[in-house]
Amino acid sequence: MSTALNARRPAPAPPATKAAPAAPAPKGLLPVVLTATFMTALDIFVVNVALPSLQADLGAGPAAVQWVMAGFSLALAAGLVTAGRLGDRYGRRRVFALGLALFTLASAGCGFAPSAGTLVGARVVQGLAAALMGPQVLAILRTAFSGAAQARAFARYGLTMGVGAVFGQLIGGLLIRADLLGLGWRSCFLINLPIGLAALVMVRRCLPESRSPQRPGLDPVGVLLVSTALTALVLPLIQGPRLGWPLWTVLCLGASLALLAAFAVHQHRSTPTDTAPTGSTPTGTTGPATGTTGATGATGTTAGATGAATGTPLVDTRLFRDRAFSAGVLAQLAFWLGQGSFFLVLALHLQFGRGLDALGAGLVFTAIGLGYLITSNTTHRVTARLGVRRTITVGGLLMAAGLALLALAAYEVSDGSVWWLAPGLFVDGLGMGLVIAPVTAVVLAGVEPRLAGSAAGVVSTVQQVGGALGIALIGLLYYGAGDPTAAFGHSVLALAVLELVLVALVRLLPRTS
């Protein structure tokens, strides 16, 4: 067995062609990229509690309110894969800074929007800006850190994502209740201005430039196919539940599958046929000084290939030959199928099922936050002791147990107190803290630095598509139940099953992950 596994691994690269060990990352690098991560996570989830206020203030109808959420998600999902390639080609710091500046500007547009239409347009720009930043953050963490430092960096990334997601609800509730300067819901967007401007000042000082030495092409056919496919996939998933799944949503879903298949075929044909997608750099890949390809000079085509490529693929399909990458992507999909819908279902249950205001709902979310902070801050040490597979397994089982406790509280507790939900939320938070960082790090840990942007784009896209798909599927269950209490109970039970699916998929990861 060991011999067979070793035979599938690429031979180590000669010392001259290995990527040189990265210099110690500047001290301010991690805070800068994690600030952008926090801003994005906060902006996604703070809107959950701001919707009723902005709807009343702008006189927005249900369709406009839906597009405040949908416009951001659609632009984000459609742009992630392409943004990963832009970072590889033009420089991750440059693309990250562009995304950060655009996100800050769009936040001002949201905060000062005079109408629902203007707000939706600004949210679309926010989504595009978040798409520019997301893959660069993951690629920078992959290329700037190694070994134990990389594990700690991804643990901080997971901590930041969770804090933004969990406490975003509370921060939004506090801002709306405080009504600073009479801004109300607008402060939920305007809070990004000082944070974004401070981060922009730090980018030049703390963030070194990095890019693929091969300056890969943009693959315009691939960009068109994947952007159209993801738009056709995510749009009906967002609009379908509200509209009752009219014919056009079904046709869009069918078209998205066909377009994704065409994209996969195009990427496979464009990918060189050498067998070293991850781990070490294949022989002749990168000249140590010039960054040109060893076999083809400066053409930008991957070197060392034994077969001709028809172009530069947007996603190098050799990535999926690596078991850790492909199994990790599946685990990511299962995780975000559940988490993408859980926060929305809980917010709906608290505000419409239990009648809480934005601040009250945000306070309930602190139970998840406390559990999450306890485990996510020590995930790298737990992973070092247990390994990735066992850590994610323990986390998935804790999440399933927490969700089962929530279902029990929904079905059996009749006094109406929301604090009966606290034990289940706390246990779910403990599990979530053990999953987010390892399930992200395991996908990217073995990826070559030259492919970091492309791989990060895939991971970020899976997160967004998984979340949209989860919202659509769990939304059918939630809105189909009728009674709010039963709807919540049925939904969290289904989510518990999804966490068990995650635990099963983790078994596909290599034992040495």
Task: Please provide the spans of the model-predicted regions.
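Transmembrane-helix exit segments and adjacent C-terminal regions of multi-pass membrane proteins
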Residues: 2-29, 244-246, 284, 291-300, ...
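A residue-level signal for alpha-helical anchor/packing sites in multi-pass solute transporters
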Residues: 140, 174, 202, 232-235, ...
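Interfacial helix-cap and linker-helix signal at transmembrane-aqueous boundaries
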Residues: 54-55, 86-87, 171-180, 237, ...
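Transmembrane-helix bundle of Major Facilitator Superfamily
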Residues: 2-12, 19-200, 378-379, 404-407, ...
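12-transmembrane solute porter fold
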Residues: 26-49, 274, 307-513
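Helix-loop interface residues and adjacent transmembrane-helix termini in multi-pass membrane transporters
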Residues: 59, 89, 112-113, 144-147, ...
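Hydrophobic transmembrane-helix bundles of small-molecule transporters
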Residues: 178-332, 338, 356, 364, ...
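Alpha-helical transmembrane segments of multi-pass secondary-active solute transporters
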Residues: 65-66, 95, 153, 187-191, ...
